[in-house]
Amino acid sequence: DAVLTGKRTGPVIFAALLIVLFWLTLVGSNRCSDWLQSGFDRLQALFLRVCGAWPPLLADAVWNGVYATTARVTAVMLPPAAIFFCLFSVLEDVGYLPRAAFLTDHLFERCGTSGRQALTMCMGLGCNTVGVTGCRIMPTREEKLIAISTNAMIPCNGRFPMLLAMGAVLLGRENDLLLALLLTAAVCLGASGTFAVSFLLSKLLHRKPPAPFVLELPPYRRPQPKKILTDAIFGKTLHVLSRAALVAAPAGLILWVLCTVQVGGMSLLQQLARTLDGAGELLGMNGAILIGFLFALPANELAIPVILMLLTRQSLGTAPEAGAAAQLAACGVGAKTAFCCLIFSVFHWPCATTLQAIRRETGSLRWTLLSAALP
C-alpha cells in the first residue's frame, strides 16, 4: 500500500495499469473481431438458401439492414468488451479499485465532492449506465447529482471503436501500444473534464463542504477465475451486448430505408449528410461523421459502421470492418478531422440507455437534459 497509494508512485502505477489494460484489450480483440466478422459474412450463403423464396426487397432489408448492422456491432464490441471486462474484474477482485479511489480523493475534495465519485468513474469506463447506477453510493443528493451528470465524460467501452479508428488515422498507423497510450490519454482528458465540471456544479449548488471520506481498504485477495469470468462475461459483457443488439436491429432497418429510398438521384441518408455538412464542419468534421454520432444515440457501437457506410458508399453487408482506419484515410479523413472526432467522442451526449438511467436515478427531466448537454 505504501507503493500503490503513495503520492508519487500511486498515480504512476495507476496510469501504467490503465495502459497495460488497454494494450492487452487491443492485442486480444483485433484478430477476434476479424474472425467474428468473417464468420458472420460466411452466413450469407446460408441466408440466401433460407430466404431464397422471399421478395428481394424484404430479403435485402433483413440482410443489409437488420442482420448486417447487428453483426457489425457484435463483431466490433464483443471481443474488446469481453477482454476489457475480464481484466477490469481482475483489478476489482484483487482489491485495487478502492485504492484508485483513495488516490483521487484529494482531487475530488478540491472540486467540492467525494472520492467515492472515482469508483463511479471506474464503473463508467466499462459502461456509463452502470456508472450512473453506481452513483447511489454518493453520501448526499448534491454529490450524487454531480457524479451522475459528469459520468458520461468518461469514455465507455462502446466508444472504444471510434477512439481507436480515429486514433489510428491520427497516428498514421495501427500500433497497439500507441493506441493504448491514446486511450489512456482520452480517459485522462475525460477525467479532467469531470473534475472541472464537478467544481463548477459544486459552486452552483451552493452545497456545504464535502463530508469526510472514510474508506476502508480491503485486504488484497487472490483472483478467483471462475468468479471473474462469470461476472465479466455473464454479468457485464452479455448484458451490454444484448442492449446494443436490441437497438442495433431496428436502427439497421431505419438505416436501410434511408439508404434505399432515392430522391433526386441521392439516398435520403446522403441528402441528410449533405444537409449536416455545415454543422459538421463547424465541429471540424463533416455531415457523414455527425450522422454517425447521431445514430450512435441508441448505442455508441453504431458510430463507426454508419460512418464507414456513408463514406465508402457501401451497404453494411458489404463494407468490411477490418481496416477501418485505412478506409477512413482513403475517404479523405485527415489528422485534423480525426483529432476533432476524438475530442467529440469523449465529450458528447450519453447514449439513450444512460439517459434513461439518469432520468430514473435523478427523477428529474431537468437534470437529464443537463447531463445530456454538459459534455
Give the positions of each predicted feature:
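Juxtamembrane inter-helical linkers in multi-pass membrane proteins
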Residues: 42-50, 98-128, 207-232, 312-323
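Hydrophobic alpha-helical transmembrane segments
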Residues: 2-54, 60-93, 175-199, 242-252, ...
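Membrane-embedded alpha-helical segments of transport systems
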Residues: 125-131, 150-166, 184-194, 298-304, ...
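Transmembrane helix-loop junctions at the membrane interface of multipass transporters and ion channels
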Residues: 157-182, 353-365
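Extended, low-charge hydrophobic alpha-helical regions
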Residues: 30-69, 111, 131-147, 252-375
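Membrane-helix cytosolic exit motif
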Residues: 193, 197-210, 354-355
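Long hydrophobic segments that form regular secondary structure
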Residues: 203-211, 220-264, 274
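Cytosolic juxtamembrane amphipathic/interface segments immediately preceding
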Residues: 1-3, 59-69, 107, 223-239
